[in-house]
């Protein structure tokens, strides 16, 4: 065997290995590929997706917080879901607690990068620790 044939055999072997790896990755992610295609099939011929999709692998407000009590989470409160942390509840501008009917709505609101909401902490008000909202907040933290 001359050096040229050895180089060609090595290149062919590497190419076959890469093809096998690609087939394996497609096999592993086939369900995700089908889900993505079904979600965006109506936009097949458009230039951009133009659909709000939230990828929490890229942005998570809890990524840079190391104290567990400060991390935002969604919990069940009065048959609805609310975003809580040690700082308080996520709220509307008029200091009403923002409530969601489903946990997915709460998660999408809490972990959306575009959401800049107010925070309402009922424990720093005049009635303070006697407030039902404050008692609940302390119980989940």
Swiss-Prot record:
The keyword Amino-acid biosynthesis belongs to this UniProt entry's keyword annotation: no
InterPro entries from the UniProt entry: Poxvirus_A28 (IPR007664)
Keywords: Disulfide bond, Fusion of virus membrane with host membrane, Late protein, Membrane, Signal-anchor, Transmembrane, Transmembrane helix, Viral envelope protein, Viral penetration into host cytoplasm, Virion, Virus entry into host cell
GO biological process per UniProt: membrane fusion involved in viral entry into host cell; symbiont entry into host cell
Keyword Plastid attached: no
TM region positions: 1-21
Mod. after translation: Contains two intramolecular disulfide bonds. They are created by the viral disulfide bond formation pathway, a poxvirus-specific pathway that operates on the cytoplasmic side of the MV membranes.
Family from the record: Belongs to the poxviridae A28 protein family.
Name used for this protein in its record: Envelope protein A28 homolog
Annotated organism of origin: Yaba monkey tumor virus (strain VR587) (YMTV)
């Amino acid at each position: 065997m001359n050096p040229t044939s050895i180089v060609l055999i090595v290149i062919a072997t590497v190419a076959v290995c890469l093809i096998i790896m690609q087939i394996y990755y497609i096999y592993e992610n086939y369900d995700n590929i089908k889900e993505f295609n079904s979600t965006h099939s109506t936009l097949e011929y458009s230039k951009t997706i133009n659909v709000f999709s939230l990828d929490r692998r890229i942005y998570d407000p809890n990524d840079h917080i190391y104290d567990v009590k400060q991390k935002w989470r969604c919990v069940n409160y009065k048959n609805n879901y609310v975003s809580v942390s040690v700082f308080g509840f996520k709220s509307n501008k008029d200091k009403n607690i923002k409530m969601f009917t489903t946990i997915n709505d709460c998660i999408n609101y809490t972990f959306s990068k575009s959401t800049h909401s107010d925070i309402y902490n009922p424990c720093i008000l005049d009635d303070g620790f006697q407030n039902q909202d404050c008692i609940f907040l302390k119980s989940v933290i």
